[in-house]
């Protein structure tokens, strides 16, 4: 009899573990749907009659690593809450990034406040040659081969928004060809033409 009680207790423990696994599976799967990068967290103090009240701000970059990215800014009394608000804000500002394979179609420069960021296409295998804030945006957008240089402010917030401005300024070769009235072969980079010939969409 005592042995049966111990077996029953073990079974109940496994049932509880299974229930915890099932209940925790949903949120874990949802979190992996997007790539999230926290670029900066700042503490903000507000002086009131009774003293100072502290809150936190978080700059977050969210993307699907497949051409979609967004940036959000969250503020709350606790760091996790600020990050969560930043993630939700970033998802509201998603936009598509034109890509050719694993790089960008053409060189582009973005400016925001005092931040200036220059992006250049790179050959496969180069990797993301960029600093932390720029790298966060590019990795979330799914750009894996690119050269970058920050020409302005070193403020992470300005750099992130300048990078977003640069990505928003990218144009697909089809758009450039239509605007100039030229055939696609005259404006598309060789890498894109080779990829299309191999059956890989740009």
UniProtKB/Swiss-Prot annotation:
Biological process annotations from GO: translation
Record-level GO cellular component terms: small ribosomal subunit
Single GO term (MF): rRNA binding
Sequence intervals crossing the membrane: none
Compositional bias annotation for Gly residues: 1-13
Regions of compositional bias (Basic and acidic residues) in chain numbering: 14-23
UniProt keyword list: Ribonucleoprotein, Ribosomal protein, RNA-binding, rRNA-binding
Domain S5 DRBM: 34-97
Positions of region (Disordered): 1-31
Family in the record: Belongs to the universal ribosomal protein uS5 family.
Domain notes: The N-terminal domain interacts with the head of the 30S subunit; the C-terminal domain interacts with the body and contacts protein S4. The interaction surface between S4 and S5 is involved in control of translational fidelity.
Subunit description: Part of the 30S ribosomal subunit. Contacts proteins S4 and S8.
Role this protein plays: With S4 and S12 plays an important role in translational accuracy.
Record PANTHER family: MITOCHONDRIAL RIBOSOMAL PROTEIN S5
UniProt xrefs under HAMAP family: Ribosomal_uS5_B (MF_01307_B)
Protein name: Small ribosomal subunit protein uS5
Lineage per the UniProt record: Bacteria, Bacillati, Actinomycetota, Actinomycetes, Frankiales
């Amino acid at each position: 009899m005592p042995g049966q009680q111990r077996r029953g207790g073990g079974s109940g423990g496994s049932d509880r573990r299974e229930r915890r696994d099932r209940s925790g599976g949903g949120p874990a799967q949802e979190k992996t749907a997007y790539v999230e990068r926290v670029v900066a967290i700042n503490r903000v103090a507000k002086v009131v009659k009774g003293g100072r009240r502290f809150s936190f701000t978080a700059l977050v970059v969210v993307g699907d690593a497949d051409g979609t990215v967004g940036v959000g800014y969250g503020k709350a009394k606790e760091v996790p809450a600020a990050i969560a608000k930043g993630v939700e804000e970033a998802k509201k500002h998603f936009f598509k990034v034109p890509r050719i394979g694993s790089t960008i179609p053409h060189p582009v420069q973005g400016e925001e406040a005092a931040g200036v960021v220059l992006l250049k296409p790179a050959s496969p295998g180069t990797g993301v040659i960029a600093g932390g804030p720029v790298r966060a945006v590019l990795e979330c957008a799914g750009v894996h081969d690119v050269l970058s240089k920050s020409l302005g402010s070193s403020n992470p917030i300005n750099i992130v928004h300048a990078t977003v401005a640069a990505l928003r300024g990218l144009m697909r070769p089809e758009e450039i060809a239509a605007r100039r009235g030229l055939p696609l072969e005259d404006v598309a980079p060789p890498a894109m033409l080779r990829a299309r010939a191999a059956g890989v969409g740009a």
